[in-house]
Amino acid sequence: MGFVEDETPWCGGHVSARVWCVRANNPSPMTYVGTNSWIVAEPGAKECVVIDPAPAGEQVQRILATCGEAGLRIGAIVATHDHPDHIEGIPELVAATGAPVYAPRTSRIEQLLQKHGFAKCGGVKRACSEGSEDLGAVEAGAAGELDSGGLPHSCEEKAGWGADVQALPKGAFRPFEEASEFEAIALPGHSEDSVGLLLPAEQSLFTGDVLFRHGPTVVFHPDGVLASYFASLDTLERLVREGRVRRFYPGHGYPINDPLPIIEATRKHRVDRLNQVKEALNAGTLAEPDALFDAVYQGVNPALRMPSIRSIRAQLKFLGI
């Protein structure tokens, strides 16, 4: 067995007692059928965790609607990594809910929030209008209404409300009292900050862009490192063989119910690509990404040329070239 060719597109839905998937309508050669945003709540709970809310706009509204239909408030937002197709909806979701954000690397998310009008006020991250002075007001009524952008009247009037961005804790953690227990597991390679979010109650792992059922991911050099990616595949295999994980929830495409064949297919793909690069170099191809793409990546969608170039750079670094 290897990668699985989907007979019908993945559409998301209520996939387990604790987990919903809202699949975004952003298909592309990079995002496949769309980004998976995940909602996680304990049975009977009134609050949930949202993982990877992106893109903004329609997807955020669908996440809010799904939570509303399930009778859930959003108590926390978590990112598996900080690529745009996994974090772009965070400002809009924070504006709508005031939920804290947890991420393995916070700088890009903080920049995104600031771009959308959030700022640090009074030593604590609060939502302020862009261009305002410290606790400047936003155009809204004093009774607590939101403006058209979803921002509160002012930081002062909404003390405690705002963009609270925190680094993911090490080890087991619950974002709030009735939340499911998670454990962040470092899975660098696709990006330096990539993590898997283990849900022990279901022996499931939210893998972001580390592993897909339908095909390989990209190692985004220089942030992504191939040696780290191989180590992350080993980590995934160990988690499965130890019985800690039985199911993967990826950032794109169907859940992975039989992980070991997909892990092995992914590892084989990476090794085969390395061997193809070495063969091309031995045959006289220049050690330049564009030349190697033309020699090795024949048949690849031209829209994937630039991501493939990033992976080729990662391969050359791995080979010490």
Name each model feature, range by range.
Residues 33, 55-180:
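Active-site HxH/HxHxD metal-binding segment of metal-dependent hydrolases
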Residues 10, 28-29, 165, 186-188:
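Short Gly/Pro-enriched turn/cap motifs at secondary-structure boundaries
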Residues 280-321:
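C-terminal regulatory/interaction regions
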Residues 98-104, 206-208, 304:
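Short hydrophobic/aromatic-enriched beta-strand-loop microsegments
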Residues 5, 9-70, 196-208, 213:
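Conserved beta-strand hairpin/beta-sheet module of binuclear metal-dependent hydrolase folds
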Residues 60, 87, 229, 233, ...:
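Aromatic/hydrophobic pocket-lining residues that form the small-molecule binding cavity
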Residues 46-50, 55-57, 118, 122-130, ...:
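Metallo-beta-lactamase
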Residues 80-86, 190, 252, 315:
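Histidine-centered divalent metal-coordination motifs
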